[in-house]
Amino acid sequence: MFDKKLLESSELYDKRYRNFSTLIILPLFILLVGGVIFTFFAHKELTVISTGSIEPTKIVAKIQSTNANPIIENNLKEGEAVKENSLLLKYNGTPEQTQLSELLTQKKQALDKKVQLDLLQRSLTNEKNEFPTADSFGYEKSFENYEAQVKSLEATIQKSNQAVEDQNKSTESQKQAIQNQVATLQQAIQNYSEIENAVSSGGGVSQDNPYLSQYNSYQAQQATLEADLKNQKNPDETAKQAAKSQEESLKSQFLSGLASSKDSLKSQIQSFNVQESSLTGSNAYDNSQSSQILTLKSQALSASNKEMTDLNSTLTDLETKISLQKQDDQYSQVFAEQAGVLHVLPDILGMKKIPIGTPIAEIYPLLKSETQVNLTSYIPSTQISGMKVGQKVRFTVQQNLPQPEILTGIINQIDSAPTAFKEGNAYKVSATTTINAKDLPNIRYGLQGKTVTIIGKKTYFNYFLDKIMGRGNQ
């Protein structure tokens, strides 16, 4: 018989309800209910996926071809880091470079010559040699020649003045001798006049009169005549008259002799005066030494100033030619205007000749820590409607790396007009991000990867509902 007590045991219920159906259906039901509840609260990111690349935020410099001549040196390398003024291209322009080198050499020589010419002018102004070292342009020799001319002029004038001095001394000596002779003759005339006065007026004659002997002789003759008259006894009137006549004749002859002697002396004095007058025109000293040296100095300075003017004109002409030649020469070489990363345009690589004005390369900013770059992608026009400035973009580098390289940026620009491609129209979208130091080894300009743009969020319930209802394409 059946024992009803068995219905009250747990073993019965365990055997009755512990089966496959109860063990599977209940968990699945609970899971389904939980999943449905999850769809109401959990959100799904709505994304737009595309292919993008890393681009610079700005172009530091654009480089164009400056010459159509054959290229003899080409340093254009894609992705190469270049320094400012690095040589990128060199065209066949050797003749122009040679001419520029010659012009620069001429300029250096002209400047060196100007320095030496300035030393010459200083030497002339200061009247001493200002050349510290040997002069290769002959200006020191010119100053030495100037000094030699000055010394020669000084010697000539000194010699001339010495001759004048000697001549003047000789003239003075002759004049003094003549004056002494005239004084002697005048004294003789005075002595004769003294005797003449003594004879005529009975005056006395000094004992130091050199002609006293003549006067004494005259008096002796007079005394003889008087003695002869006295010796005559009772001389008659005729005898007296004869004696008196002899005395008068003797006196007259003596006075006539004195007068003749005085006239002779006066004639000699007149002759000496004529000689003295002929000696009065003595030569004057040459006092033109200072003015002649000044004239010589002025001539030398004037010549050097003219040469300095010509030299400055030559330098100006050379500067103009050098400037023009540098303009020509700069077109025979292309240099990097600024430091950065070189991007060579694809059509340029390998070309031997490039037409003038053809763009050949661009220089991007150097990639370093904290450098900003653009994450650039092209979004089909069918997916662009949900994209806005300020949305996040995730860029994943498509390379075999131990760990995926992911960059996150913010959209800062969406083109207002689409770009046409074979596959259709697409809008250019740029997002800005900052490179960290750890990202630098794996980052290059032009590197491609997958871009994921988060344009919004939906609950999973709404997401699946839209899918079922055919609304939206996300």
UniProtKB/Swiss-Prot annotation:
As for membrane topology, the entry says: Single-pass type II membrane protein
Might you name a Gene Ontology BP term for this protein? Answer: protein secretion
Keyword Protein transport in annotation: yes
Keywords (A to Z) from UniProt: Bacteriocin transport, Cell membrane, Membrane, Plasmid, Protein transport, Transmembrane, Transmembrane helix, Transport
Q: What is its main location?
A: membrane
Q: Which domain of life is it from?
A: Bacteria
Topological domains (Cytoplasmic): residue ranges? Answer: 1-21
Positions of transmembrane segments:
22-44
Protein's cellular compartments: Cell membrane
Q: Name one GO cellular component term.
A: plasma membrane
Keyword Protein transport in annotation: yes
Coiled coil ranges (UniProt) are: none
**Any ranges marked Extracellular in the topology annotation, and which?**
45-474
**Which family would the database say this protein is a member of?**
Belongs to the membrane fusion protein (MFP) (TC 8.A.1) family.
Give a short account of what the protein does. Involved in the secretion of lactococcin A.
Report what the protein is called. Answer: Lactococcin A secretion protein LcnD
Q: Tell me what organism the protein belongs to.
A: Lactococcus lactis subsp. lactis
